[in-house]
């Protein structure tokens, strides 16, 4: 399942989730399918998982969220989808806002601020 998320195989992954695989399945580091899709730059997979109830507020063992991963990878589409699903840019030990600030990603910071009215 995790490789499907990493590789952006949206339709195949969605079929497994529709057949009963937990949409919030985590690996040994606490990374969800949603986090892996966001980190590896697959906004279509992010959208497919969100449509099936993936929780954008889940944190891995480092306190990172899917939104933080999408910001780090500078995926505007994934960031927008996650914000639209209610992701909090201030959540986590390494929040999306902190990540955008630390890595000097002004376009991501603007998107986060505009998207959540912060």
Predicted regions: what they are:
Residues 12, 44-45, 77-78, 107-111:
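Conserved ankyrin/ankyrin-like repeat signature
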